[in-house]
Amino acid sequence: MDKVSADPENNEIYLAIAFNKILVFDREASGDTAPKRVLAGPDTQIRFTEQTVGSGDVLPVRVDPVRNLLVVKSQGLNRGDPGALLIFDRTASGNTKPLRVIKGPNAGIGGGGQIQITPAGWIVAGSSGGSIGVWNIMDNGDVPPKWRIPVLKLTGVGVNGVAIDSIHKEVFVPSGNGNTVSMFYFPEIF
């Protein structure tokens, strides 16, 4: 479900699909329903890898209902290029430019497909070097993460995603290659 984000406050569902699009549906829609909004086009900078089989390598999308924002993890233009975190107004549609873009060598957007947004406004996502990085939702440009968890160094296994537990102030990092879930107490981001 990391390719789908539900926004219970605004009663919407966001779905990232191949062909570099974000579809927005009414949460209560059923049947063959057209999306209420589509975010797509070259100005959006939304890029997923080429679709070859199945759904391709579609990256996650998350809604921040507190700040009325949408965060999309995008890939570089070419294979191996660093990725980006694209921050849009939640209601953006069409070929809309992001409000802010976090990308570049210092930003180090990297592996681990999932992203999360904490209630305090921190984006938690995969970072370079087998780590999890934490950026402020107001960051823009080639901004290094405020904090980094060096998961690979600490556990010996790579990053496959991220989940957060706001109640216990923890970050969970699963790893398929080690069949493990590592848990980190991280009160600073909650």
Task: Identify the residue ranges that each predicted region occupies.
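Short loop/turn segments that connect beta-strands within the blades of beta-propeller domains
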Residues: 9, 18-19, 66, 81, ...
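Beta-propeller fold detector
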Residues: 33-43, 96-104, 143-151
